[in-house]
């Protein structure tokens, strides 16, 4: 417990998901400033948080079929951000970086990218341009398909990752037109 003020952001579309109740509910604590590696891989580091993690996990199944091994990292907190520089360690291993966020362009994904590139100095370890995949710069459409056309989808994640892989290895990952 702390007397320090805190802001917690909850993704509303996560409320609709059904999950098992954790057995350690009273004991579980998320350390502030620590990231969590959810999936280990060697080809590309994807950093995200909140409800987009499920979208990325769905895309990972298809990306693995395409021969791409994803390292998925949950940022968990922005201030402080990745105190142990675990994202930099991952980028050193994969040489590629994608930040996925359901917020508008220039939001949390831009902050995360700035922290990894400028504060953690990841530039020298990249084989391709680091990218952000965020929501479209418009108001979401109402209806059942509003999120699909406004926020990053499983298909968007797959396409973006595949293009990043193509950029550094076009022979192994040819573009399909």
Q: Language model features by range: what are they?
A:
Residues 1-4:
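Internal gly/pro-rich beta-alpha loop/helix module
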